[in-house]
Structures are given as C-alpha cells and as structure tokens.
Design a protein with these regions (language model features):
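Cytosolic, long alpha-helical scaffolding segments
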Residues: 1-220
C-alpha cells in the first residue's frame, strides 16, 4: 500500500490530510480511555462526559473536512488519486467509529455499580490492550512496516478472540446478569477491530481492506 500514499506524502499533496487522520485516531483513543476509566473505576461519568462528547465532535468535524479535502485532491490529481482517496475514505470511517463506541461505553457507566469487581478485572487488561493498539495503529500507518503490521493483525485477532471467550462465558452463566460486561467487551472488541482495519491497509490490497483474517469493526 506504500505507493498509494506517495502523492499524499508530497508536501504539496495531502500531508495535512494525513495529519487530520492521525488526529482522529488520537482523539478516538483519548475518548475511549476516558470512557473505560469511568466505567471500570465506578466514578461519576458526568465528570468526563463533556470532554468525551467534545472529542467525538472534533473527530466528526475532522472526518467531514477530510472527505471534502479528498474530493478536491482527487479532482486536482485526476484518476491517479482515486485509489488513495478510496482507501483513506474507508479508513476515516474506522477512526470515526471509535468515538461512537466511547460514547456507548460512557452511557453504560451511568448505571451504578454496572460492573462487578470480577468483570472489571477481566475487562481492564483487554481495554488497555485495545487502547495500546490504537496508538500503535497510527504509528504503523505512518511507517508502513509490513512485517510489523502482519504481527499486529495476529495480535489483534487474539484480542478479539479473548473478548469473544469472555462474552461466551458470561452468557453461559445462568446465575448472574453480565449484560453490561458483555456490551462493554463487545465495544472493546470492535475498537480493536477498527484498529486492525487501519493496519490492514499496510498489507492488504484495496479490495481486501477490512477483510484481514478475523478482522473488522462492525461487520461481525
């Protein structure tokens, strides 16, 4: 995929678009971390609600601006820019969805003692892993390191299976209601999937984007 980004890395091309995309990923991680901290700690979600929603609005505005810039970029550059524009148009949706999941998690945090201590202990490391993956996804997108990207996708696949296993165990537990824990873990799984989609752009052809083994954010 490296060749597709050459016209964006040109100072007269779309460096500002790449910076905008990186900002979306960074903001998504920030909102996700705030929401996870609120629900795991049992703290008052109102304390971070404004920041989470403002961050999500910033993500949305960047997505809209980036779409407009991609249209202009493709119009100026012609057909040679179409593959790059299609690719980045897809990836910005992955970045945008992370803010939505952060809001979903924060909504669950409104309920008192929504997670048991046991659930918190299982969810915390999975959420930390997903957050770390968001940061690494941005760096891999920049470096276009194919070997590191392939290793990342294997790791992402493992985290998603870990989330699925936890959800299966909670659903099979007839003695307790684990519905909130299942939802939070599902959101974590999808955040990891969106990070994987971004990284898949390093190693997958455009037509196979989002179809890396076990990957994806919303289709599963």
């Amino acid at each position: 995929m490296f060749d597709l980004f050459q016209n964006l890395r040109d100072p007269e091309g779309g460096q500002h678009m790449l910076r905008r995309f990186r900002a979306m990923l960074s903001d998504g991680r920030h909102a996700f971390d705030l929401a996870i901290t609120a629900i795991v700690s049992g703290g008052d979600p109102a304390a971070v609600r404004e920041e989470v929603f403002e961050t999500d609005q910033r993500i949305n505005k960047n997505e809209q601006a980036l779409r407009r810039e991609l249209i202009v970029h493709a119009s100026v550059r012609g057909t040679t820019a179409f593959p790059t524009s299609l690719l980045l148009m897809s990836l910005v949706k992955d970045a945008e969805r992370i803010g939505d999941y952060a809001k979903n998690i924060l909504d669950l945090a409104r309920h008192k003692s929504v997670l048991s201590e046991e659930e918190q202990d299982l969810i915390t490391p999975m959420a930390a892993k997903a957050s770390d993956m968001l940061g690494r996804a941005a760096r891999l997108f920049d470096s276009q390191d194919e070997a590191a990207a392939a290793a990342f996708l294997e790791e992402e696949h493992g985290l998603r299976h870990q989330c699925e296993a936890a959800i299966d165990d909670w659903i099979d537990d007839a003695d307790k209601n684990h519905s909130a824990a299942c939802l939070v873990t599902r959101f974590i799984k999808r955040v990891a999937g969106h990070a994987g989609n971004v990284v898949s752009s390093v190693v997958m052809p455009l037509d196979m984007l989002d179809f890396h083994p076990g990957g994806g954010g919303d289709e599963d």
